[in-house]
């Protein structure tokens, strides 16, 4: 990314949020836009695809506190001063040459380098001078997938189709034409920086000969024009482990955006959304369900067959069970990450018949009389009696 692009891109506007937006607001805005603009939801729509890429790029920066801080500092530092096209320019910090990519100054950001102070410290030899050019690791990428309740509980392998910067398939990320190789820059000897003195200060600045990369490509790849990166659509197979919960993020190392000229790729983060189930609920590793029973079954007791994630199991309802009681079946819940499984929690709920035939009504009347004769009072001890 050129210095002007870095400064002029408004990631906040891209997501439709203010510059003071919280992480939750940023995440909510991104999720809505990503769902609306995803290539799978807009097949053949190139405008939606480009917008999806821009939204993903904005989220990758603003969702990372360190990257967001550096982005804000960069815009404050350069945007307000009418910066010259070539960089800091006359009167600035050493007059960088025209065409230098400010992304090379901030190239270590995705790899977890420090903030703007570290960068300026390097320019003015504060805390030591860089001796080697760090590879520019690719940016992290975020995407989402929705699973069924049982898929999330038991684990599943899903294909994810996504469009992002990836290593060039022609040069395999080197940036050089097949059959050739980049050569070490003779000016900086591969360090990517050159040093000079001005008065009492020693300066380190990106090398003009190699644009701070440490190497020179004499014969660039015709497909990626020397960057080593191409935008392409790919399908990644993602293994979702058993027991994943709604909103959980899964990291796939090295599956994010490709690094510059063969540098390491970023990571892919997949946020999992879990659909509700008609039968089951979940409480941590425990599986929950509500079991309809009759009054007679609660009073007399019974055994009822109920579903689990891997078949059915008989649940014994003891005689005299109260409505709303929860019965526990150990080890028949959601698989745990370290092995074993949670429990199945079965809550009994009495189902009141809406219509009874004459025989049933007569039997129920006889039961009511017998209940009174036994001295049973359902409201005994009730505070409202």
Swiss-Prot record:
Q: Which cofactor does it need?
A: Zn(2+)
Subunit structure of this chain's protein: Homodimer.
**Where is Zn(2+) 1 annotated to bind?**
168, 171, 221, 224
Q: How is the cofactor bound?
A: Binds 2 Zn(2+) ions per monomer.
Q: Which InterPro entries match?
A: DnaJ (IPR012724), DnaJ_C (IPR002939), DnaJ_domain (IPR001623), DnaJ_domain_CS (IPR018253), HSP40/DnaJ_pept-bd (IPR008971), HSP_DnaJ_Cys-rich_dom (IPR001305), HSP_DnaJ_Cys-rich_dom_sf (IPR036410), J_dom_sf (IPR036869)
Comment on protein domains: The J domain is necessary and sufficient to stimulate DnaK ATPase activity. Zinc center 1 plays an important role in the autonomous, DnaK-independent chaperone activity of DnaJ. Zinc center 2 is essential for interaction with DnaK and for DnaJ activity.
The segments carrying the CXXCXGXG motif repeats are: 168-175, 185-192, 207-214, 221-228
A GO CC annotation recorded here is:
cytoplasm
Q: Which SMART domains match?
A: DnaJ
Family assignment from sequence similarity: Belongs to the DnaJ family.
Cellular location(s): Cytoplasm
What the protein does?
Answer: Participates actively in the response to hyperosmotic and heat shock by preventing the aggregation of stress-denatured proteins and by disaggregating proteins, also in an autonomous, DnaK-independent fashion. Unfolded proteins bind initially to DnaJ; upon interaction with the DnaJ-bound protein, DnaK hydrolyzes its bound ATP, resulting in the formation of a stable complex. GrpE releases ADP from DnaK; ATP binding to DnaK triggers the release of the substrate protein, thus completing the reaction cycle.
Q: Please name the source species.
A: Nocardia farcinica (strain IFM 10152)
| Major place of residence | cytoplasm
Q: Which Pfam families match?
A: DnaJ, DnaJ_C, DnaJ_CXXCXGXG
Positions of Zn(2+) 2 binding: 185, 188, 207, 210
Q: Which PANTHER family match?
A: CHAPERONE PROTEIN DNAJ 1 (PTHR43096:SF54), DNAJ HOMOLOG 1, MITOCHONDRIAL-RELATED (PTHR43096)
Q: Which GO terms describe its biological process?
A: chaperone cofactor-dependent protein refolding; DNA replication; protein refolding; response to heat
Query: Gene3D superfamilies in the record, alphabetically?
Result: DnaJ domain (1.10.287.110), Heat shock protein DnaJ, cysteine-rich domain (2.10.230.10), Urease metallochaperone UreE, N-terminal domain (2.60.260.20)
Name used for this protein in its record: Chaperone protein DnaJ 2
According to the UniProt entry, its GO molecular function terms are: ATP binding; heat shock protein binding; unfolded protein binding; zinc ion binding
Supply the alphabetized keyword list.
Chaperone, Cytoplasm, DNA replication, Metal-binding, Repeat, Stress response, Zinc, Zinc-finger
- Indicate the segments forming the J domain, all copies: 10-75
Q: Where are the zinc fingers (CR-type)?
A: 155-233
